[in-house]
Amino acid sequence: VIECPNSRNYVRLLTYIEGDFLKDVKPNSAMLFSVGEFLGNLDKALIGFEHKSSSREFIWDAAQIHVLISQLDHSKNDRSLIEYFIELYKDNVFGHINELSKGIIHNDGNDHNVIMDQNGKIKSIIDFGDMVFSLQALEPAVCMAYIAMNEEAPFELIASLLKGYSLTKALSEKDLESVVYLMCLRMCV
């Protein structure tokens, strides 16, 4: 904040990170493995971090299905599809949600927020505004959902990302089983 005689001005200083957004490069398995590793390392670094805003009602937290359900009236065209994925989540994940790993996650590793270097390695991630205390498996699921949405044959790519993440930040078998449902819910938000 810069105080002037007749005004108060807010200034934000940013560091420019050179590279290309993931959306602008053709992903391969090795590249997405490194993205998964990066996300896993980020989540490991966030262990023990606390913030009062991390536990809030938040539409972008796909694990908060009550928020998604409250918004169904705004999704008339896709309502039945969204309800289908909500039911899958309830049937396959919600019943054992207390067994799933939780922590503060970045929660927005989409292809517009991941910056790659010229060698196909992740350089950085931006946009920390969607951070939330949620299911750990949601971290790779968010990125995997955007990869799957933009690729004709995504399975090898998203498997590589999940492998990179889980080798860095271990996920339980139940966590791993929840990933596909969390991917689908993220696309419903």
Predicted regions and their residues:
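Short, conserved phosphate-binding/catalytic loop or strand-edge motifs used
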Residues: 56-67
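ATP-binding pocket architecture of kinase catalytic cores
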Residues: 1-50
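Generic structural signal for conserved hydrophobic packing positions in ordered secondary structure
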Residues: 12-14, 42, 105, 140, ...
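Active-site activation/catalytic loop segments of kinase-like enzymes and analogous catalytic loops
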Residues: 136-170, 184-189
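Catalytic activation segment of kinase domains across protein kinase-like and atypical kinase folds
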Residues: 113-139
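An alpha-helical support segment within catalytic cores of ATP-dependent transferases
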Residues: 48-51, 65-107, 117
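Protein kinase-like catalytic core scaffold
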Residues: 12, 103, 121-124
